[in-house]
C-alpha cells in the first residue's frame, strides 16, 4: 500500500496499453506505477506494490523472467497480459 491506497505496477512496452490501464485503475482509486519493460519493472518493484500486471512479450526482459526476479523478493500477486494462448504459455505463467 502507498498512502493508504492499493498500489499496482503495470509493465508493458506499449504506451497506449499502460496509459489506458493506468487511467482505468486510477479512476477506481488505485495508485499506479508504470514501467516500459521487465527491467524497469524489476527496478520499480517494492514491498508497497500490491499487484503486478506484466506483459509477457516485452523487449530487454520479458514478463516471465521479470516475474521470476520479482517473486524472489516480493510475494504480491502477478497477472500476465498476453495475446499468446498456447498451453505452454499458460503453464509457464503458473510456474513463475
Positions of PLM-derived features:
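Conserved phosphotransfer cores of two-component systems
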Residues: 45-48, 69-76, 96
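Acidic catalytic/metal-coordinating carboxylates
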Residues: 37, 62-65, 70, 89
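Acidic, metal-coordinating helix/loop segments flanking the phosphotransfer/catalytic sites
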Residues: 34-51
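Two-component/phosphorelay signaling modules centered on CheY-like receiver
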Residues: 15-33
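Non-catalytic signal-transmission and effector/linker regions of two-component phosphorelay proteins
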Residues: 1-9
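A short, hydrophobic beta-strand element within the central beta-sheet of small alpha/beta folds
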Residues: 75-85
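Receiver (REC) domain active-site loop signature in two-component systems and cognate sites
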Residues: 58
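Active-site residues of response regulator receiver
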Residues: 12, 55, 82
